[in-house]
């Protein structure tokens, strides 16, 4: 068991940002092993993975722009049918949390919405590769780059 798995072990509701999913889908040379470890954890009994429709948007924009509708469909299918990850809509309570997070930390709106929804759902960890989110204190921000040499 690696350090990422040890750090995630204490979290039963884990929110996942877009990048770890893209690394998994694209089998990214550097980050794929970390994404695999994350999804092993999400497959554990009593562990719930969540993400939001923001991830659907962010993941599908580039392939849509490239005319890769096959990838758009595959990413949508993966998110909608995943047994390890539940995709949430953004509701008013999550948006209100996002307002506070954006005001306090100056983070981008999509990140604030993702974290706001995570907090509203009871997540205690947010897995990302965006170091700018490390300052958020309301949730444990797990940054993939922190687990690489």
Task: Locate each region found by the language model.
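Short acidic, glycine/proline-enriched helix-loop-strand junctions
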Residues: 70-71, 75-97, 103-105, 110, ...
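Short, well-structured N-terminal submotif of metal-dependent ribonuclease cores
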Residues: 1-51, 64-73, 77, 131, ...
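Active-site neighborhoods of divalent-metal-dependent phosphate/nucleic-acid chemistry enzymes
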Residues: 2-5, 36, 85-129
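Short amphipathic alpha-helical elements of helix-turn-helix/winged-helix folds
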Residues: 23-24, 62, 97, 101
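A structural micro-motif
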Residues: 12, 47, 85, 124, ...
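Hydrophobic side chains within alpha-helical segments
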Residues: 20, 61, 114-117
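Short secondary-structure transition/capping segments
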Residues: 62-63, 122, 137-141
